Design a protein with these regions (language model features):
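Flexible "arm" and connector segments at domain edges
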Residues: 1-174
Length: 174
């Protein structure tokens, strides 16, 4: 998945839905941390997407999404990537001009929550430039999803389609 294309698309949807006002980078990064917490909650509650039921569903796509995908580990991991991409789009980050992130993690050697904490910690290191933290987060969530055998681009595309049809700020204050 091309991070630059994702960041432009995610940011466009977010702007169209009223998510961008003059707030600090920390405000938006905290919303990513919230999504990481929601991923842990989905894991704790054993909520996994039912792709087969979703794809065979006869109800409107939004209803099928809410029934079989929403609030699952896959959905929440997609939210992490989408928020990071959105912030990258707002900041005009060009991933093609960045050196690759050298971070490596043996995901299988750590628990789900430890991996979530490592992602949170990496995103919150304010001694590192915001661009590098976002790049780290994007690479981390994609590698983590791959380790979990989650087709993250598939779930990102589903969530972006779902988000495009939601109300202003998805009915939330921010």
């Amino acid at each position: 998945m091309n991070y630059n294309e994702l960041s432009k698309a995610a940011h466009k949807i977010a702007v169209n839905h009223g998510f961008w006002s003059k707030k600090s980078n920390e405000h938006y990064m905290m919303l990513v941390v919230v999504e990481i917490g929601e991923t842990v909650e989905a894991h704790r509650n054993r909520r996994y997407a039912d792709i087969k039921a979703f794809e065979q569903g006869t109800l409107p796509c939004v209803v099928n999404f809410e029934r079989f995908i929403k609030d699952t580990i896959e959905d929440e991991m997609a939210d992490i990537a989408i928020w990071l991409a959105d912030i990258a789009g707002a900041l005009g980050i060009n991933f093609d001009k960045m050196n690759p992130c050298r971070y490596h993690r043996a995901f299988d050697k750590f628990s789900f929550t430890e991996n979530a904490f490592a992602l949170t910690k990496g995103l919150c290191r304010d001694t590192i430039a915001i661009e590098k933290r976002i790049q780290f987060g994007m690479e981390y969530v994609f590698k983590w999803a791959k380790e979990l055998k989650i087709d993250l681009p598939y779930f990102i595309n589903l969530k972006m389609k779902y988000n495009a049809n939601r109300p202003l700020k998805n009915g939330k204050a921010y």
